[in-house]
């Protein structure tokens, strides 16, 4: 709940990410009236107990009793919720209270739950700041506090608990060794400690923008900041949640030269330049491989060894010459930029380019680092392809109906500039998950870039936020549509996607998110590619052209749907900050459960293994049918014989005279006597066998019986009377 009193003590700065997140879902920005406050004024963030005690006595007198009770209940809910899920500000205050001897300039960057191994395991939390590593544990009032300056660290090593579980980190100084275990995200913590340690050895300090960028990547966009936090600096990129208008004021696509952008995209980041000098002096010792953990991907981004055990020692000789970071938006992330995505930018050297415009756009805005889903050439103009995909066209309406999207609302493109436009879409997607909701609302934001007003090609970045699905506040997906005009009636469509995280989930949750999200993304864009191909075919048929000849000459090249490797190219952030604000509907977690709306053609893309399995299943079905027929035949034969026997008995003649009955009785007596004689023989044989067994048991008993000891045979003297 939000308190709208103008003198609240919990007012966040104008650049706070919580304000930007609330303004994200509003309609397109309009010029504010003269009565609205300036951008530098404070905006209310939440209600607090102090907000009702300072300068609001006049306002409280006009409020109703029910309103005040509602606010009081909301405060109670916030109190216990803050205890269970403390904000970054609360964690930072706890950090300063626990480690009061540290310099006041030290600010918490991230904290992890872990345990210190001594005589017993001391469960606590590990706190990381720019220059210190701190640990605090409190077990039944037994407090343990450790503070290690990063410059004093001599060795940083990954370890295994009990030589089996890869969840430990060992930090060594000249005098002590500290063994921390029970990490939930060991590799990510090791990577951040290593980068902070590397920065301390190089005597590099973080700028406020770089520090807050790291804080946002570790704790998300909601930090719980107030107006008292004057040192807050909003980074340029908040994992794609920044305002496109605000980022567009920093960088305009039309002002970037193709050559400069291409050179800038290939220039290594400050982290890469320093790592290139530090890594040759590092001694690495890997014990045994541990490639099963999900966090090992983050370890590979740093160019380190991918094994589960890794030792890093500091540089023996000082590094005197260091290149200064380049100026510009790409250097604002600084040497400790932990990108929200785990992959690097896609290398666009393999993409074919027929015109200079395609090369310019590819150099300015390369593919996203996730997966390339569509890379096709269509025999239609770039303008027409853009109208089909990004306007209220019959093609888009039919496609959304096939995907069973409802409550579709398309806002018009903002007309500020033809080179930089933006619009917001809202709709509802179906979900076939039986345990979850049946539908989910989606808010999609699309940002369009052009090289010029008359340019045929364009780039559209989209981002989507799906509400009402599991872990909706942890991630979102980004998509980039690149439409390149190759000729008058020929254009290329490239669509790349990636999953971006606002918070860092557990490895199990992360794998679940990626599995379900990529399944929905691939299904959506494969469907879109097929529908575009159908529309192209209809267009060619209406034009009276030879469809077969033209379609056979179409050059279609699709890349395999695989993750980009970390070492395919230089490690550098996206040159355009607006690319962090892209998203699409199919990338949500619920898209995996959406009903498929279009059936594929017969024999389209059927692998050989599926054909073999189908043949085996057909053979098994035939064998089962044959076995069923045999069993049915045997049962029918048995019933036939039984009916014949009963029929024969029914047609037989019964005895009529006394002589015939006497013969039957004599036969019966004879049969009875034979049976009695047989049973007597069986009983006699049984008795004989029992006698033999009894005799054998008696002999066995005599053989194992121990003889009694001999009695004393000496004669006893007789008592005689004299």
UniProtKB/Swiss-Prot annotation:
Transmembrane segments: 609-629
Gene label: Gramd1a
SMART domains (alphabetical): GRAM
Free-text domain note: GRAM domain binds phosphatidylserine in the PM and mediates protein recruitment to endoplasmic reticulum-plasma membrane contact sites (EPCS) in response to excess cholesterol in the PM.
Domain VASt as annotated: residue spans: 369-540
Protein role: Cholesterol transporter that mediates non-vesicular transport of cholesterol from the plasma membrane (PM) to the endoplasmic reticulum (ER). Contains unique domains for binding cholesterol and the PM, thereby serving as a molecular bridge for the transfer of cholesterol from the PM to the ER. Plays a crucial role in cholesterol homeostasis and has the unique ability to localize to the PM based on the level of membrane cholesterol.
Tissue spec: Highly expressed in the brain.
Sites of Phosphoserine modification: 265, 269, 273, 417
Keyword entries, A-Z: Autophagy, Cell membrane, Cytoplasmic vesicle, Endoplasmic reticulum, Lipid transport, Lipid-binding, Membrane, Phosphoprotein, Transmembrane, Transmembrane helix, Transport
CDD domains with a match to the protein in the record: PH-GRAM_GRAMDC
Annotated Polar residues bias: 578-594
GO cellular component, one term: autophagosome
Protein name: Protein Aster-A
Entry membrane topology: Single-pass membrane protein
Disulphide bridges: none
Stretches with biased composition (Basic and acidic residues): 565-575
GO biological process: autophagy; cellular response to cholesterol
Domain GRAM: 93-160
Listed Low complexity bias regions: 8-18
Cell location: Endoplasmic reticulum membrane; Cell membrane; Cytoplasmic vesicle, Autophagosome
Region (Disordered): 1-62, 256-336, 561-600
GO molecular function, one term: cholesterol binding
